[in-house]
């Protein structure tokens, strides 16, 4: 299979950005669909809370697409590029699932998705410039933070919202696997100040996306 030229890779990254932010998405795997207990009815308040939380999760997947796209662009290691691209395809499932669930809840995606994508893409490029080990370390830390964030959402999502809870649980399982794969590929441990900075940026994103 012919390797893409640098120009082709940049064009592909631009196309990925536009499709992630503006296009509808299809999943390669069906969304988890648990049996619904007819005795568990969601109130309007439940739906509003779930929509806000799933919007935050959707933003997280927009950022994941940007991170993996930029890191795939930054590495010259074809095996590592393939790993990033595979993880991005799984994250596309998450993007499609959260998007569809938001529609079911009469919610909406974040108005700031172009900004979230651009910021995450820039961070991924910086990580990529620091070398493959640092780039993989960035993946590990990101996925661990997302995994913890999803666990917190499982505590906050209404008990009656079994559909959203099933989606978030599967997403958390996938994120843990992505972190483990990055560790196995040779991830470096990021300095503590960098991890703190990443947590601060993630907190800003989640608190903003919860509302807009």
Curated annotation (Swiss-Prot):
Catalytic activity from the UniProt record: a 5-methoxy-2-methyl-3-(all-trans-polyprenyl)benzene-1,4-diol + AH2 + O2 = a 3-demethylubiquinol + A + H2O
EC number, UniProt record: 1.14.99.60
Binding sites annotated in the UniProt record for Fe cation 2: 91, 143, 175, 178
GO biological process: ubiquinone biosynthetic process
GO CC annotation: plasma membrane
Gene Ontology molecular functions: 3-demethoxyubiquinol 3-hydroxylase activity; metal ion binding
Cofactor(s) required, per the database record: Fe cation
Functional pathway: Cofactor biosynthesis; ubiquinone biosynthesis
Binding-site residues, Fe cation 1: 61, 91, 94, 175
Keywords: Cell membrane, Iron, Membrane, Metal-binding, Monooxygenase, Oxidoreductase, Ubiquinone biosynthesis
Superkingdom, natural source: Bacteria
Protein family according to the UniProt entry: Belongs to the COQ7 family.
Protein name: 3-demethoxyubiquinol 3-hydroxylase
Lineage: Bacteria, Pseudomonadati, Pseudomonadota, Betaproteobacteria, Burkholderiales
Gene name of the record: coq7
